[in-house]
């Protein structure tokens, strides 16, 4: 008997479950369909994060305006896994994997029998290279190994944008400061610490600055502060984002983040290629 039920108008996703709904109930979400005609729809790869409004401070520490960050973020049920995989990949790819030890067959010398087999009162011994003797070989010691892990560029970008979105959405997690490169006529750490205090930053807390171009005097004034990281889009990485207590951005850096990691960002053609280098530009 043929069913009289009509086809649903649309599909929507709620709490990782598939429900039928009308066209006016479709939430704004970004989904990826693996194969057309396969009848299977994959889970959302990324969704728009909550719009984060950030205050803009002048060099003197006064609020002069507001700006926003609207970045892609992984769904709540997969965000932790996406960020964890990306940070493990970065840390593993930084390992040299050159640790090496010598086995008893590689240790130099010790070919002669140390003493007679009998009449010494000692245990019989055939070589000085045995792992039981000082200077002998090592049993199951470390050997050179490639620790690198591959990760898709889209996945790495999603992890970075998720971390940035989380930091920006947290109360007091991020601020925007007007360009201050010309304010430092000469390198002086004392002046930079005073500026940080005007911006509400504690020098004892970890802070990450993201600037498009770092002035030479700014770089020299801040390099003696152990809790501070001064980054550019070329050196932006997930570890420093997660390790920082507060993010400090410039207006140009905000525009860069919205353009590269925002909801309307255009994906690159080679985003599906794998990455193994942890120091590549994110």
UniProtKB/Swiss-Prot annotation:
SUPFAM superfamilies in the cross-refs: Ribosomal protein L4 (SSF52166)
Listed InterPro entries: Ribosomal_uL4, Ribosomal_uL4-like, Ribosomal_uL4_dom_sf
GO cellular component terms listed in the entry, alphabetical order: chloroplast; chloroplast stroma; chloroplast thylakoid membrane; cytosolic ribosome; extracellular region; nucleus; plastid large ribosomal subunit; plastid ribosome
Region (Disordered): 106-138
NCBIfam families to which the protein is assigned, alphabetical: rplD_bact
Subunit structure and binding partners: Part of the 50S ribosomal subunit.
Name by which UniProt lists this protein: Large ribosomal subunit protein uL4c
